[in-house]
Amino acid sequence: MRLLLLASACALGTAALAQGTPGAHFIENWDMDGDGLITVAEIAEKRGEIFVMFDQNEDGALDAAEYDLFDETRRADIEANAGGRKGPMALVDQAMDRTFNDADGDGLVSLDEFGAQAPAFFDMLDKNGDGVISSADFKPGG
């Protein structure tokens, strides 16, 4: 059920918005308060929601099978709705990858490990260093 909700949420992108605004699909999905700006707190909140969606056995860790499904779903969404894994979207994909999030290298990604990477993920995308992620961070040279 959670995966169906994630797939539905990912598919709800506004096509016209996505075509005209750099990073629109990402902003639409990660801007939790709808102000067009993403804070580190919103990144942390969304990462927590994503973790819960893919922790199918609810044991507090993403195992190899759960992370494989997460990788497949995320990459399909990026390809279909965000112009593919290039530019800033390559950074999004990298920051959600298992190797980025498995801090202790045990093959499992705990909620604590996943959540602890929120600030690093934010810093990767806040290219202009203004303390928020906006469409400006997705423009060439952002």
Describe the role of every protein-language-model region.
Residues 3, 17-142:
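Calcium-binding acidic motifs and repeat modules
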Residues 1-9:
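Sec-dependent signal peptide recognition
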Residues 13-15:
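N-terminal signal peptide c-region/cleavage motif recognized by signal peptidases
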